[in-house]
Amino acid sequence: MRAILLLGAVLALAVPTVSAGTPGTSLTITAWSVGGRTMHTYRLTCAPAGVRGPVAGTLRPADACAALREIGARIYLPALSEHLKGCNYIQAPPRASIVGTRNGRRVRTAVQVGGCERPLVPVRLLRRVVRFPAAAVRA
């Protein structure tokens, strides 16, 4: 009976080391403020999904890693914002670049928040009121 309990304890200890061998998520996030005036760099490392506790030597901010899991693959798409024709920024919007690995696969993407996703004035009205150079109208 003791041998079975000892074997069970050894197997229970071996399971986390097996899942700890799978790659986790390691991202370097560089964020710029409005107008690109200030820049901040953050490094985020998450343990693999199968690991319940922090892995030795791994910084694991639980809330940020949980948010990344909730958002899922959507955040790793090539770009999250769309640019509309006839829309110009007065100042550059807040933006971020995300570079690193997700579950062992390379990640490189850029995100812009705000800006021209929803223009306040329809582009047709904007073209009537504002005179664009000829090259900008054709674009």
What are the residue ranges of the model-derived segments?
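N- and C-terminal low-complexity/disordered segments
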Residues: 2-139
